[in-house]
Regions:
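Conserved GNAT acetyl-CoA-binding A-motif
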Residues: 119-129
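Glycine-rich acyl-CoA binding loop
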Residues: 106
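GNAT-family acyltransferases
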Residues: 1-103, 116, 120, 161-176, ...
Length: 209
């Protein structure tokens, strides 16, 4: 599965193809692992093993995020909890390196995954969940058009700590409007000569409601 956009390509995560680039992107940034199930990778070999585990994971599809500007992997994301019988899939285990955070490529990557889930795989419900204390992830979900559904208290134990999970969703009946907002935001005319957005994604979505 390869998803291509104007500013980014998502391709199957591969230890052979992506370890070196991802190590350069995340090395020394242990804070990136705070909210993930994985512990920080202290060496490139540790990162390779982590990626190999993700390649072999059952019930999940991990994709490397490769910005067109550099051609080098700068993060990953996955489809999880895929339940075709119920039409439900989750996007999760998202790792954005500092170079990928707050970029057009990062937003387009999330758009491409949502579009593939709804338009090509035919899912009815697209989920996002995170540690309830992870405020940046909660803000990101809302910016991307997910609806907050509530808190699952004492939902998991992660790294020895109890976790409450915040749940968000997007439905197929909502996707057409979300898609229009994404595509309007991604238009080259929405960015100035230095790549700064003229209108935010939330502004565009609100104007279309």
């Amino acid at each position: 599965m390869t998803l291509r956009g104007r500013t980014v390509t998502l391709e199957p995560l591969s230890a052979e193809s992506h370890t070196a680039d991802l190590w350069k992107a995340v090395r020394g940034h242990d804070e990136l692992w705070t909210w993930l199930f994985d512990s920080p990778c202290g060496t490139e070999a540790d990162l390779r093993r982590t990626i190999e585990e993700k390649q072999a994971a059952r019930g999940a599809v991990f994709l490397a995020i490769v910005p067109a500007e550099t051609g080098r992997a700068a993060g990953w994301a996955s489809y999880m909890r895929m339940e075709p019988a119920h039409g439900v899939v989750e996007v999760g285990s998202i790792l954005f390196s500092p170079s990928l955070q707050r970029t057009t490529a990062a937003t387009e990557a999330m758009y491409l995954m949502a579009s593939h889930a709804f338009d090509h795989l035919g899912y009815r419900r697209y989920e996002w969940k995170c540690n309830a204390q992870n405020l940046p992830s909660r803000r990101a979900a809302e910016r991307l058009g997910f609806t907050f559904e509530g808190i699952f208290r004492q939902h998991m134990v992660i790294k020895g700590k109890s976790r409450d999970s915040a749940w968000f969703s997007m439905l197929d009946s909502e996707w057409a409007a979300r898609k229009r907002a994404f595509e309007a935001w991604l238009e080259p005319t929405n960015f100035d000569g230095e790549g700064r957005q003229r209108q935010g994604l939330g502004q565009i979505a609100a104007a279309q409601d």
